[in-house]
Amino acid sequence: MRLNPEEVSWVIQQEIEKYHEDLSLKFESAGRVLYVGDGIARVWGLDDVMMSELVEFPDGTLGIVLNLEIDNVGVIILGSDRNIREQDIVKRTGKIASVPVGEGMLGRVINALGQPIDGKGAIETKEFRAIESSAPGVVQRKPVNEPVQTGIKAIDSMIPIGRGQRELIIGDRQTGKTTVILDTIINQKNTGVCCIYVAIGQKSSTIAQVVKILEEHDAMKYTIIVAATASDPAALQYVAPYSATALGEHFMYNGKHVICFYDDLSKHAQAYREIALLLRRPPGREAYPGDIFYLHSRLLERSAKLSTELGGGSLTAVPVIETQANDVTTYIPTNVISITDGQIYLESDLFYAGVRPAINVGISASRVGGKAQSKAMKKVAASLRLDLAQYRELAAFAQFGSEMDKTTQAQLVRGERMIEVLKQDKFKPISLSKQVMIIFTGTKGFLDDLPLPFIKNFENEFYLFMDENHPHISNSIEQSLDLDQKTMEQLNEAVTKFKSDFKLRYQI
């Protein structure tokens, strides 16, 4: 039988047209799973896939492409790998990982993918934002010039934080790092600032405790908690801080002010090390991959104070690093110290000595926050850091028991009282005006002749006295953020009167 080529082509053409009529063919780029385990998969056949692209497994689980190799791609699985098998088909989505953003997220506890895990139902929001985005450029930024009031006397007076700054909290475990964060969140009530707390690799019970504390202080309504617990895969712990930053960027680009707390980046680095080793990336120092610095720098560089043209919003980053045996010279702590604009160092020796918050002022620093500090605080706390530094030096010398002159004794007395003034109960942030007034009292020498056990009572009763008898002084400081000569004289008179009454009452 002899075939006519024209007839054959006509028949083929008819068959093709029939397909066009019956169904619209969809071409998908797909590959097959070569290996799966420990939260990662190696996939063959995805030749045209992009770096960081989302891919989908047959059970609906998503993964992010993290390694592009000659014959396969390495994928981190965002969820359980229990139902994924070798030879399963993996499809490209053509999308980069993104999370839902918007006002509807406030007050909720979500996972690293933006899905609610607090049992309060679905989140109503239609906006999404890519978890990875480039940091604002130099022209888009503005110098840090507005303060973030933490409500903690030691921080607001000596290590001030500005909106758009990156300030590291560093210290051993159980030294009060999370307490400093919770105090700061509670103090943002009625300021219009949104707070995002990212829990990386923490116990679920710890996160539940954080939620309970914030609810008790009515702080959840302006807070988002992003939880990647210790039981979550390393991939979700790796993604969580980037998702939280995307949430914060949405508010920042809409002209709002956001503080993002990353608790903590040590566990984040460990999760990334685990992923990198499983993907067979070459290990470097302490077995971390070569791009571990870039992991944190690209995250923290997204924090900024935007220019007025872009709305003037800000994203302040407060990362946490956990040290071992007070050693800040190891790899990850030194990396993050060099990326951030300052650090608050919490010391276990101070914590156990009863100095809480256990801030070591000598090692702590704020490289840009001083420009944002209020004028009132600058005036009263100017000599505070020097007083404490001199006290620490003299206290070490005084242990030898040698005789000291009156000036040295006066410096020791002043230092002891200022340390007592800077102690603070947890979850009780103090307003700017009260901080200014009590630090003024200490630095001007009003407390020098009071016995140490009475300092706490003096402080508490002094606040009540000022609220009842001199509310105009507090109002003046809160409104102008300054302490003019007239207000300073009024404050001086008020402190003098209160002190004489206090000494009579306690027969000092």
UniProtKB/Swiss-Prot annotation:
Return the protein name.
Answer: ATP synthase subunit alpha
| Broad class of where this protein is predominantly found | membrane
**Where is the site described as Required for activity found in this chain?**
S364
The entry describes its oligomerization and partners as:
F-type ATPases have 2 components, CF(1) - the catalytic core - and CF(0) - the membrane proton channel. CF(1) has five subunits: alpha(3), beta(3), gamma(1), delta(1), epsilon(1). CF(0) has three main subunits: a(1), b(2) and c(9-12). The alpha and beta chains form an alternating ring which encloses part of the gamma chain. CF(1) is attached to CF(0) by a central stalk formed by the gamma and epsilon chains, while a peripheral stalk is formed by the delta and b chains.
Protein residues bound to ATP: G171, D172, R173, Q174, T175, G176, K177, T178
Q: Which residue windows are transmembrane per the record?
A: none
Q: What does this protein do?
A: Produces ATP from ADP in the presence of a proton gradient across the membrane. The alpha chain is a regulatory subunit.
Q: What are the annotated GO cellular component locations?
A: plasma membrane; proton-transporting ATP synthase complex
Q: Does the keyword Cytoplasm apply?
A: no
Localization, per the record, is:
Cell membrane
Q: Which family does it belong to?
A: Belongs to the ATPase alpha/beta chains family.
One matching Pfam family: ATP-synt_ab_C
Q: Report the source organism.
A: Protochlamydia amoebophila (strain UWE25)
Catalytic reaction(s) noted:
ATP + H2O + 4 H(+)(in) = ADP + phosphate + 5 H(+)(out)
* Listed GO MF terms: ADP binding; ATP binding; proton-transporting ATP synthase activity, rotational mechanism
Q: List, alphabetically, the Gene3D superfamilies matched.
A: 2.40.30.20, ATP synthase alpha/beta chain, C-terminal domain (1.20.150.20), P-loop containing nucleotide triphosphate hydrolases (3.40.50.300)
